[in-house]
Amino acid sequence: MKLNISTDHAPAAIGPYAQAVAVGNLVITSGQLPINPATGAFPEGIAEQTRQSLTNVKAILAEAGIGMDRILKTTVFLSDMNNFGAMNEVYAAFFTEGSYPARSAVEVARLPKDALVEIEVIAAK
């Protein structure tokens, strides 16, 4: 049975989708843009945007009753692969060395609201 996960500590969906769904022991988030849920604004720069996207992921997982250590796989969408290094530095700080999740990072032509980064995850309860 599928259960939608929703929290006010992450931005509301900007379309007809859930922040995340839980099915069985999996939690699958929608892509998280770097929207500050309190202000609706984007921070400046790739480092700050990466931090906000991952903070949003963390809030959604907390609503599901799990932490970042339960992430199995992330997908990082970048509007410019030249931002990979700066994104990677911030990304690493959200995980414990030696227990990083699997990850794909891809450049895309454009992200919603012209974000620099969007991050989605699959986690296990």
Task: Cite the ranges covered by each PLM segment.
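Short, polar/acidic, helix-capping and beta-turn segments at strand->helix junctions
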Residues: K2-K125
